[in-house]
Amino acid sequence: MVHQTSIAFVGDYSPRRCGIATFTSDICEAIAAQPQVNSNIFAVAVNDVPDGYPYSPRVRFEIREKVLADYYLAADFLNINQVSVVCLQHEFGLYGGASGSHILSMLRRLRRPLVTTLHTVLREPSAEQLLVMRQLTVLSDRLVVLSETGRQILRDVYGVAEEKLAVIPHGIPDTPFVDPNYFKDKFGIEGRKVLLTFGLLSSGKGIEYVISAMPRIVREHGDAVYIILGATHPKVKRESSEDYRNGLIRAVHELGMQDHVIFQNRFVDRDELMEYIGCADVYITPYLNEAQVVSGTLAYAMGAGKAVVSTPYWHAVEMLADNRGRLAPFRDSDAIANEVNFLLSNEVERHAIRKRAYNYCRRMVWPQVAQDYLKLFSAVCEAWSGRPRSKLAGQAAGGGLENEYELPEVDLRHLCALTDDTGLLKHCIYATPDRTMGYGTADNARALIVSGLHWVQTRDDNVLELIQTYLSFLWHAYDEESGLFRPLMNYDRCWSDDPPDEEAHSIALWGLGYGIAKCPHESMIALATR
């Protein structure tokens, strides 16, 4: 085996609340724990919030998701440190740019061996996604997929050569095969039949269909209780607050199932998670998207020896084959109820399914997965040492979504200096705001466009105050009598004698149009459309 002096993982990382963050953290620790490893194992973490996260010392470099320059710096960091191999965690929504294309700029600049783990593989990608994937396959020395379905799609849809592909399953904790009753008293549910779904909450999870199935389940099994474990996904919470969870809670009350559905709205650590999984009699993944090539929650549940009821998304079809679980059609509450009732009523069959699932997943425990990755890294390093990636090779993989120009990070300090609680001042003396010139409607409309675009790129909540200020100015600028926007306001907040004109009016409408498209909150959009 070729010795690897350092291994770098690129992706999001714990304590960020995301399935891939958990995966990246787990694979780093699993590899570092292998007895033959004396390598320097570290991570390059991707941040989706401006202030980042309180990472462990394992994280040596941070990339701001929307800042292209950070990707170039990350490549330089990896090159300068002469890492033995880079393992990239890829999902389209993880990186900035069109369909996550910012990561390509880093990879084209990278001069180290690259293994890419694909957490999403689409059979019908958009044009942008297809372009990103094709460049990713060229720039990577090997591609890892977490299921046979992913390998088949890469071969058939993207034309990737078989020898470039490796299947390494999603890692899982190595847990004992235990009776669910062992953990139930800890959660106050002893003597009950426990159904469980865990993971970060979002509308694609399909949990509403299990809730709709609960009355039928309870009619046959009055002691059944359904636990929904997990906080709302941070991105969902930023964009729509707790709308999905609140809708689920309303459905529970409308069905009178308050005594049979428990919400645990929190992100639990691994030890507590495994105790929750341990107490489940039936684990349910009612996901709505068929094109899901991997599910970490499904792997965890099966690896703990759970009887699973799932919708037939790709990973579930593969994992639950050979009677290792039960499938129910998408969006079908009656079918879910039938499958759950069957398992709860047939203890012998339920335990047989549990055992088949548990035995099948022994190859997926983290120590084994870590060994699989180390063997792959060794093979890649050995092959790469004879033909290292040149700068020209990286440039040859360039496509239409990114170019090689490094743009500076957008700096809003001067815009903020020119903005007071009324709006954006028209002019300045050198860099100092000139109050004698007052405020212009057209300028505030343009500022609304800039701040809206900046928020979309960075999700920096500090920009929201600017958006509110410019939107408020435009609302005040509208003259109902003429049906036009007034063009100028003096510094004393009185409108100038200049009559409304069509130029200011058209630019204001342009700004409000962008406001409707880019404003993050419904209240802002509602005001912009008035």
Which positions does each model-derived feature cover?
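Nucleotide-activated donor-binding/catalytic signature segment of Leloir-type glycosyltransferases, i.e.
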Residues: 239-267, 271, 422
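A short helix/loop element that forms part of the nucleotide-sugar donor recognition site in Leloir-type
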Residues: 177-189, 194
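Conserved acidic donor-binding segment of nucleotide-sugar-dependent glycosyltransferases
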Residues: 322, 326-333, 342-347
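Short hydrophobic beta-strand element within catalytic cores of glycosyltransferases
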Residues: 302-303, 307-310
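A short, well-ordered alpha-helix in the C-terminal region of glycosyltransferases
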Residues: 342, 349-363
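Low-complexity, Ser/Thr/Pro/Gly-enriched N-terminal "stalk/linker" regions
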Residues: 390-443, 457-489
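Carbohydrate-associated surface elements
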Residues: 149, 171, 232
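Conserved donor-binding/catalytic core segment of Leloir-type glycosyltransferases
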Residues: 9, 189-205, 211-214, 227
